[in-house]
Regions:
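Charge-rich (acidic/polar
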Residues: 12-160
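Bacterial Sec-dependent N-terminal signal peptides
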Residues: 1-17
Length: 160
């Protein structure tokens, strides 16, 4: 059992190869601001979590860049229904790719940190939009029951 955990929780490599050094530095700085608030005391764990988070930003950027290139091509070269179909296909491909890697991120983090810390990372990445949107909705619809509020919060959390 320990052998599998040790192999799974090995050092995380930063996916910086071929990336603009200034972009890498910017992503690391953004990621450090989030990771620094988690209370991680072990330097190796902190670095692994930092690299997982930075790699997530890189992966998200890569996915959106592919989509943007396909949309740009469609707008420049195609016309009419073909153009619209290519744009929609690029969006669907982006969504499918995002869905496929959606669970990979918290699973990787869970090797090093607990669920509360994972939620703190997600909140940091989304600028606490979960709480902001939830509180705004509850303020706009004061007639919500506690059960409805719990369900809405669960939906927002899942969407995050």
């Amino acid at each position: 059992m320990f052998c599998c955990v040790a192999l799974s929780a090995s050092a995380v490599e930063l996916d910086s190869l071929g990336r603009d050094p200034n972009y890498v530095k910017s992503i690391l700085k953004r990621s450090e601001k989030i990771v620094d608030n988690l209370g991680i005391t072990a330097p190796a764990v902190k670095q692994n979590v930092l690299y997982i988070l930075a790699n997530r930003y890189f992966k998200l950027n890569d996915i959106y860049e592919v989509r943007d290139q396909k949309v740009k091509y469609a707008k420049a070269v195609l016309t009419g229904a073909s153009k619209q179909a290519a744009i929609e296909a690029a969006e669907l491909e982006k969504d499918a790719t995002l869905y496929r890697c959606h669970f990979e991120f918290p699973a990787s983090l869970s090797l090093y940190i607990n669920d509360k810390q994972i939620d703190a990372i997600k909140d940091g990445m989304t600028y606490n939009s979960l709480q902001v949107q939830y509180e705004s909705l509850v303020d706009m619809v004061p007639s919500l029951t506690e059960e409805e509020k719990k369900q809405i919060y669960a939906w927002y959390k899942e969407a995050r």
